[in-house]
């Protein structure tokens, strides 16, 4: 049997590849990353990169031992001789906060805005929009508890999808309060669900003792039916004065900036480190609960990791899920452009010289060349196949006169360019 890529992964392929599966074009992937980078760096966010694997204890303490990620979805790395307790990262925030604490980034001006992108790993049940290796764009703002920072984070996430051209996106906004608020709410939920525990799914019965709020996020239709039947009160009814005031301020900022949102009292983020502001972006084109991504405030995460208290807020969206939404709306992205010039020798004697001219030309533009001599018609055909803007020919006649015959493929116009002026010709057209 032919070797296959692992289940729950994708190949990122060059433009023009035959579409045989759900693999993605690398240029579309890069376009999403570049759009996010442009939006976030205009806001002052700086790029950070952390390892693809971290200590398992970091993930357990950061993400939370009661989460599905820790209990069911982590990929453990066993084969390091010096340490057996590593896992492939299932999300980005815990690693970024670890890097912030370990490297003394608290000395930098606050809020410190950081962003990254890269692969994450979870042992998911593979379906549309859910992969075992997936890629995220991640934004974090550390060092401020101001609700204005929350609103800016939501605006930035909204701005990325707006610049990509998506229109069918909804922001679902909620608050999960402070720790005391959540403790009171969890007590209320235990009182609600304990008499009906036999009707809960196995996962939710386990959550009843560990973290009852996670029952509200259950994928079981039976659990959701029971929640409706019991008319379970939302977390918003249990917000204390401080959390309630914070939530109202976030909403006021978003309204002032014309960011459309819906209050969703059922918002329960899947990671234990969240508090206060929480939100998700939804689109019906991505399947699997329709979430493109989400975020929230996590002021207690740094202390869970053994550091001083550092307020923070962040978000992440899945690039593959965003591509599904773009596909569903028929949004197209620019394909990777071809070379400015494709250069070919007309006889074997001049192949090396043509290649040398191409190498010199690469100092100012993208230039490709033929690795063997071609007839003019074949050179033009190959240049067109590579989506080049110009085709250049070097034969005995051109070499003797010190020129290059250059054809503009779209118009068919031809001209001769002195070899010594080739880089000037390219630089003028590469702008």
From Swiss-Prot:
InterPro entries linked to this entry: aa-tRNA-synth_II, aa-tRNA-synth_II/BPL/LPL, Anticodon-bd, Anticodon-bd_dom_sf, His-tRNA-ligase, HisRS-like_core, HisRS/HisZ
GO terms assigned for molecular function: ATP binding; histidine-tRNA ligase activity
Pfam families: HGTP_anticodon, tRNA-synt_His
Keywords assigned: Aminoacyl-tRNA synthetase, ATP-binding, Cytoplasm, Ligase, Nucleotide-binding, Protein biosynthesis
Regions crossing the membrane: none
Catalytic reaction annotation: tRNA(His) + L-histidine + ATP = L-histidyl-tRNA(His) + AMP + diphosphate + H(+)
Major site of localization recorded for this protein: cytoplasm
Subcellular location: Cytoplasm
Listed GO CC annotations: cytoplasm
Enzyme class: ligase
Region (Disordered): 1-20
Alphabetical list of CDD domains matching this protein: HisRS-like_core (cd00773)
Enzyme Commission number(s): 6.1.1.21
PANTHER family: HISTIDINE--TRNA LIGASE, MITOCHONDRIAL-RELATED (PTHR43707:SF1), HISTIDYL-TRNA SYNTHETASE (PTHR43707)
Family recorded in the similarity comment: Belongs to the class-II aminoacyl-tRNA synthetase family.
Protein's name in the database: Histidine--tRNA ligase
Originating species: Deinococcus geothermalis (strain DSM 11300 / CIP 105573 / AG-3a)
Protein encoded by which gene: hisS
